[in-house]
Amino acid sequence: MTLNDILNEQRIYAMINDVPILRESEVHLFEELIGLYRPTSVLEVGTAIGYSALLMAPLLDKEEGHITSIELDDVRHEMAKYYINQSDYADKITLLKGDASQVLTELTGEYDLVFLDGPKGQYLKQLELILPHVKEGGVILADNVLFRGYVRGDKEPPKRFKTIVKRLQEYLTYVENKEFFNTTIYPMGDGMSVSVWKGHNK
């Protein structure tokens, strides 16, 4: 099965089973960013079924490129293993199962790209745990940061979304205003932020 076959199967599975994966409108930007930064060591929070990991894998350094990806949900973790093991990139992707807020406290590696795509209300807390492991000049991508148009603009979020929206606003305030980040927000899909980490001493 080719990589395109696997990705197509994942898109169908995600649609049928209501699994959130990158939207078609975001995929081109996502691939462009990975291709631009050419990371060798990637940390992903929110594997889902491994779709974004398989988009990234061919764009990494052929010799040293590696992805570590964390997922809490048992079924999604198993589906990610199923799809990734069918690909040519199984040796480049390490899947960890567990609550990211706990797993992140046990990190020992260093990463030059981080992709936040797990629980939206946890982005800032997770970023604070991850930053000691981000190389200077590393990049943090965060998906869904505009969350249905509620985070920026005049739309009032329904009560059930108020906490998520508030926490995403706090995340964006942090990465846009701290001097050690250079942040750009792209409006494609549900919004993606790209923050370049200038280092701990900047």
Which role does the model predict for each range below?
Residues M1-L113, K120-L141, V145-K202:
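A short alpha-helical cap/connector motif
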